[in-house]
Structures are given as C-alpha cells and as structure tokens.
C-alpha cells in the first residue's frame, strides 16, 4: 500500500502521455474536388526528398489494383489514381496499402478513391504516391485511411498509439 501513490502517479503520467501523442482522425471529404488535393499539389511543387505526413488525395482509379507480393515489409496493393490538382493539371498518383497493416485494399478501374497518409515523390509513371494509409505508427502522423467506392479501410483507429 505504501507504493500506491507512486503507482497512481505513474499511471496518470502514462495516461496523459498517450493523449499528447494521440493521432488525429481526419474525416473523409464529402466529395472529391481539386482543393482536396492541395497538400499533394504543394508536395509536388516543393519536391521534398523526405516523405511528408498527412497528405490527402482523391481521384479515379485508372486501372485495377496491382499486387506486389513479398518484400521486407510484406505484400502491398498499388492503386493508380488520376488526381486533378487545384491548378487544373491532372497527375497519376500511386496509393500503396500494406496487406499486413491495412488488409488487401483493391479498386477496379473507374472506382472513386480517397487516400490519406504519408506522401512522397514517385518516379516513372507516377508523379507522387501516398502510403502509410493505416492507423498511425509514428509521432506527427494522423491516422491514415483509404476509401474505395465508398468503403473505408481501416474502419476506425484507437485514439492513442
């Protein structure tokens, strides 16, 4: 019993610390508009060498989702979407989901897609990409998600890491 006050203090500090590092649950926009893609447009203009947390993109799948099996981080599903930027330009963006963290997320050609996660500059046929579309795994990142034809993955995330 003599350690009860110390234990209570430690539990209070741990509980408070969780809230300090809590990830935000960002809502899915009601509809896809070029303004939704503003942070993606900023990423493309700045062309950073590092990934950028909390980037959103919306657009239309240009083809069926492709699968990349295996690798050091497991299998991934890659969906290419045509994204209209606020300046009127349309670019291809790859949305990458991790099967271990997101479960398989697939789209058919012409499906509407929203994604929120960590943005990066891509090569080849994509201008950029978004991955980490799952519940947050590091400080500074909101909880990510992908919505394909109205179905959101993950359905929800805990309020703490």
Named regions from a protein language model:
Residues 15-17:
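N-terminal signal peptide c-region/cleavage motif recognized by signal peptidases
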Residues 21-161:
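OB-fold and OB-like single-stranded nucleic-acid-recognition modules
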Residues 2-9:
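Sec-dependent signal peptide recognition
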């Amino acid at each position: 019993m003599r350690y009860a006050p110390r234990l209570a203090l430690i539990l209070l500090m741990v509980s408070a610390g969780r809230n300090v590092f809590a990830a935000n649950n960002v809502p899915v926009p009601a509809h896809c508009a070029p303004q939704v893609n503003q942070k993606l447009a900023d990423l493309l203009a700045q062309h950073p060498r590092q990934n950028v947390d909390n980037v959103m993109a919306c657009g239309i799948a240009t083809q069926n989702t492709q699968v990349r099996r295996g690798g050091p981080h497991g299998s991934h599903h890659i969906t290419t979407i045509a994204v209209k930027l606020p300046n009127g330009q349309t670019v291809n963006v790859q949305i990458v989901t991790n099967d271990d963290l997101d479960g398989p997320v697939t789209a058919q050609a012409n499906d509407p897609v929203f994604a929120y996660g960590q943005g990066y500059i891509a090569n080849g046929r994509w201008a950029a990409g978004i991955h980490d579309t799952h519940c947050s795994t590091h400080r500074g990142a909101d909880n990510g998600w992908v919505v394909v034809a109205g179905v959101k993955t993950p359905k929800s995330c805990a309020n703490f890491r």
